[in-house]
């Protein structure tokens, strides 16, 4: 496994905040304007954000809007594009782990990203992914270069 250009904590946090501002806040506001109900109690909003988090990276080469703006993306640990199963593991299963551990899993992720050279968090380890600065196709070029160097 060759982790190429891993993205650290601050850039990932920035991307998550951008996603919240660009995706969640408008959804919450629209929901509130249309229904007049508290959007924090809405399963609809949760479902839309969940589908966004799982499906968009599959169709947009590992990018979510915030990650795209920050120039980072999610890839499998071999550098290939994420799949439905990968994103399911990353979002749903890891989310359950974070809930079941009452946030201790999140603390573990913060420690992992700080101490691991590859910057992989708990949800990355569960899903077999990492977050990289590499653009689509760049990992393949790097892998080819590594092969040539070893010959």
Swiss-Prot record:
One of its GO terms (cellular component) is plasma membrane. The chain crosses the membrane at residues 14-34, 45-65, 91-111. The keyword DNA repair does not apply. Signal peptide: none annotated. It is found in: Cell membrane. Its main location: membrane. Pfam families: RDD (PF06271). It is a multi-pass membrane protein. InterPro entries: Pra-immunoreactive, RDD. Keywords: Cell membrane, Membrane, Transmembrane, Transmembrane helix. It comes from the Bacteria. The keyword DNA repair does not apply. This is Uncharacterized protein YckC. It comes from Bacillus subtilis (strain 168). The lineage of its organism: Bacteria, Bacillati, Bacillota, Bacilli, Bacillales.
């Amino acid at each position: 496994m060759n982790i190429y250009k891993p993205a650290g904590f601050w850039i990932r946090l920035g991307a998550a905040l951008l996603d919240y501002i660009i995706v969640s806040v408008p959804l919450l506001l629209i929901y509130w304007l249309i229904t007049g109900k508290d959007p924090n109690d809405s399963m609809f909003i949760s479902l839309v954000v969940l589908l966004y988090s799982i499906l968009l990276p599959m169709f947009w080469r590992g990018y979510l809007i915030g990650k795209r703006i920050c120039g980072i993306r999610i890839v499998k640990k071999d550098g290939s594009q994420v799949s439905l199963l990968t994103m399911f593991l990353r979002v749903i299963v890891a989310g359950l782990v974070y809930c079941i551990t009452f946030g201790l899993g999140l603390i573990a992720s913060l420690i992992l990203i700080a101490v691991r050279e590859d910057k992989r968090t708990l949800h990355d380890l569960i899903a077999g992914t990492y977050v990289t600065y590499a653009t689509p196709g760049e990992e393949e070029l790097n892998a080819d270069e590594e092969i040539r160097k070893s010959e």
